[in-house]
């Protein structure tokens, strides 16, 4: 191995960006094929390829950062900046949905009956399942912070327990959201109300699933002694992402469920 006189990580050539891009193409085009031709083959292929890419890319990063020592302080600083910029881009992504919602609701057109919610729409009670979901996500924010402090203090078992609890709360939120969708008195096809509701809450739900997966990988890594009290950026990034998902839900709850109903 050649001597490296700097602290930066010179990344080896990797096939995973290419396979990830192909998986994304197959999934998005597969979604369109599913909607129009009722065939899920292309989307299933994309999903399988995406899962394989995720597994192998994460495996490579864990090898480089945990076992080969490539994640030096300057590299970790770069990763932190990257995660902050990624979350900032996600903020603007959700800002688009809130903009669409408020554009439609603050000045409802005559086609909507000049009122919000539009004429004929029966809304969900914000003080039933949505309020429970809010409590579940806020509790998960507490447990993920507990996990973070446990890792920093070297309390391995506490970290495992609190992280497991966070993941279970995440899956419980997803389950409740699925029930709510199933029982909703309106659909995504019910005009601007249905589309803004399901697209905004649906993308948030997708982010909860992604965050739960992220935390599940961190749990496996914690069980296998990958984290130390000083070196655990993988978990830190997952915790930041989870807090972001929490905050987005609070805005969704106040805007769409409570004020919008």
Curated annotation (Swiss-Prot):
Annotated TM spans: 16-34, 41-66, 73-105, 129-152, 156-183, 191-223, 233-256
Bilayer topology: Multi-pass membrane protein
GO MF entries: cytochrome-c oxidase activity
Keywords: Membrane, Mitochondrion, Mitochondrion inner membrane, Translocase, Transmembrane, Transmembrane helix
One Gene Ontology term from the biological process aspect of the record: mitochondrial electron transport, cytochrome c to oxygen
EC number, UniProt record: 7.1.1.9
Segments on the Mitochondrial intermembrane side according to the record's topology features: 35-40, 106-128, 184-190, 257-261
InterPro entries in the cross-refs: Cyt_c/ubiquinol_Oxase_su3 (IPR024791), Cyt_c_oxase_su3_dom (IPR033945), Cyt_c_oxidase-like_su3 (IPR000298), Cyt_c_oxidase_su3-like_sf (IPR035973), Cyt_c_oxidase_su3_a-hlx (IPR013833)
GO CC list: mitochondrial inner membrane; respiratory chain complex IV
Disulfide bond positions: none
Top class in the EC scheme: translocase
Subcellular location: Mitochondrion inner membrane
Catalysed reactions, as listed in the record: 4 Fe(II)-[cytochrome c] + O2 + 8 H(+)(in) = 4 Fe(III)-[cytochrome c] + 2 H2O + 4 H(+)(out)
Ranges of the Mitochondrial matrix topological domain: 1-15, 67-72, 153-155, 224-232
Subunit structure: Component of the cytochrome c oxidase (complex IV, CIV), a multisubunit enzyme composed of 14 subunits. The complex is composed of a catalytic core of 3 subunits MT-CO1, MT-CO2 and MT-CO3, encoded in the mitochondrial DNA, and 11 supernumerary subunits COX4I, COX5A, COX5B, COX6A, COX6B, COX6C, COX7A, COX7B, COX7C, COX8 and NDUFA4, which are encoded in the nuclear genome.
Protein function: Component of the cytochrome c oxidase, the last enzyme in the mitochondrial electron transport chain which drives oxidative phosphorylation. The respiratory chain contains 3 multisubunit complexes succinate dehydrogenase (complex II, CII), ubiquinol-cytochrome c oxidoreductase (cytochrome b-c1 complex, complex III, CIII) and cytochrome c oxidase (complex IV, CIV), that cooperate to transfer electrons derived from NADH and succinate to molecular oxygen, creating an electrochemical gradient over the inner membrane that drives transmembrane transport and the ATP synthase.
Family indicated by similarity: Belongs to the cytochrome c oxidase subunit 3 family.
Record-linked PANTHER family: CYTOCHROME C OXIDASE SUBUNIT 3 (PTHR11403:SF7), CYTOCHROME C OXIDASE SUBUNIT III (PTHR11403)
Protein name per UniProt: Cytochrome c oxidase subunit 3
Lineage: Eukaryota, Metazoa, Chordata, Craniata, Vertebrata
């Amino acid at each position: 191995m050649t001597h490296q006189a700097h602290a930066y990580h010179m990344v080896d050539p990797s096939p995973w960006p290419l396979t990830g891009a192909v998986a994304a193409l197959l999934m998005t085009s597969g979604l369109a094929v599913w909607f129009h031709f009722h065939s899920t083959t292309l989307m299933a292929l994309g999903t399988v390829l995406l899962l394989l890419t995720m597994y192998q890319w994460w495996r490579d990063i864990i090898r480089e950062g945990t076992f080969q020592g490539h994640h030096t302080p300057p590299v970790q600083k770069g990763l932190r900046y990257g995660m902050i910029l990624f979350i900032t881009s996600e903020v603007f992504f959700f800002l688009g949905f809130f903009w669409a919602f408020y554009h439609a609701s603050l000045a409802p057109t005559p086609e909507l009956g000049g009122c919000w919610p539009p004429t004929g729409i029966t809304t969900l009670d914000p003080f039933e399942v949505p309020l429970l979901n809010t409590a579940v996500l806020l509790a998960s924010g507490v447990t993920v912070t507990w996990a973070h402090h446990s890792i920093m203090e070297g309390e391995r078992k506490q970290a495992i327990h609190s992280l497991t609890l966070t993941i279970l709360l995440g899956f419980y939120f997803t389950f409740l959201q699925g029930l709510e969708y199933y029982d909703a008195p309106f659909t995504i096809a019910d005009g601007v109300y249905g589309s803004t509701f399901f697209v905004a809450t649906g993308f948030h739900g997708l982010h909860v699933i992604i965050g739960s997966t992220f935390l599940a990988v961190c749990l496996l890594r914690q069980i296998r002694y990958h984290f130390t009290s000083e070196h655990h950026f993988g978990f830190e990034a997952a915790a930041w992402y989870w807090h972001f998902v929490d905050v987005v839900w609070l805005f969704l709850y106040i805007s769409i469920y409570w004020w919008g109903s």
